UniProtKB/Swiss-Prot annotation:
Name of the protein in its database record: Triosephosphate isomerase
Reaction catalyzed: D-glyceraldehyde 3-phosphate = dihydroxyacetone phosphate
Gene3D superfamilies: Aldolase class I
Cross-referenced InterPro entries: Aldolase_TIM, TIM_sf, Triosephosphate_isomerase, Triosephosphate_isomerase_arc
Cellular location(s): Cytoplasm
Family: Belongs to the triosephosphate isomerase family.
GO molecular function, one term: triose-phosphate isomerase activity
Quaternary structure annotation from Swiss-Prot or TrEMBL: Homotetramer; dimer of dimers.
Length: 216
């Protein structure tokens, strides 16, 4: 089974009053992909009440309940029914010690982490902490039309080799727009994709997502 994570970011099309309408476009699929959506933090409570899909946060903190103004406690996520989160996205980068503390807490609480990295060196650094997913997204390709599977296939292969023999699944993001991009990524050893604008800002989000996950 492969994994497709759709990051809704804070795109107006899928946020706030538009979140429920956006999600109503989709139905669970029977196929080779598990679908996971990542709404904005302000929409997580609504997401938790939507039983059709699994939802991950876009960011989470290791700090517990308490005097932590502005933080997003992992414990609170779990109590809300959210079972995982993206971490260290290029639009929300974190210090390495913060990432390590968060990974350690997530491991104890059985909370899934999708750790974003920008290069193979960064991927290798976090190997010993065994994130559930490692998502390779070079910053310069995010939101563009050039797929990482075309521009930097050798780095995908390097990261797959780094995590060979572990329980970590490698995802590929940045510029993923077509089924061929997905097939090429999987051919390089990836176990799924992390996408955003190619689905959320599409004129037909359902069609765009289906075109990515209908492997032949």
């Amino acid at each position: 089974m492969y994994t497709a994570i759709v990051n809704l970011k804070t795109y107006r099309e899928a946020t706030g009053a538009n979140f429920t309408r956006f999600m109503e476009k989709f139905e669970p699929v029977q196929g080779k992909f598990e679908l996971i959506f990542s709404p904005s933090l302000l929409d997580l409570e609504k997401a938790a009440k939507c039983g059709k899909f699994r939802f991950f946060a876009q960011h989470v903190d290791a700090e517990p309940y308490g005097a932590y103004t502005g933080h997003v406690p992992m414990d609170m996520m779990i109590d809300l029914g959210i079972t995982g989160s993206i971490l260290n996205h290029s639009e929300r980068r974190l210090p390495r010690d913060t990432i390590i503390n968060t990974l350690k807490k997530a491991s104890k609480l059985d909370f899934t982490i999708v750790l974003c990295v920008e290069n193979a060196e960064e991927a290798k650094y976090f190997r010993e902490y065994e994130p559930d997913f490692i998502a390779y997204e070079p910053r310069d390709l995010i939101g563009g039309d050039v797929s990482v599977s075309t521009a930097k296939p050798e780095i995908i292969e390097d990261i797959v080799k780094i995590y060979e023999g572990t329980g970590t699944s490698v995802l590929v993001g940045a510029g993923i727009k077509t089924g061929e991009d997905v097939r090429r990524s999987i051919g390089l050893g990836a176990r799924g994709i992390l996408v955003a604008s190619g689905v959320v800002k599409s004129a037909d989000p359902t069609k765009s997502l289906n075109s990515l996950i209908e492997l032949k």
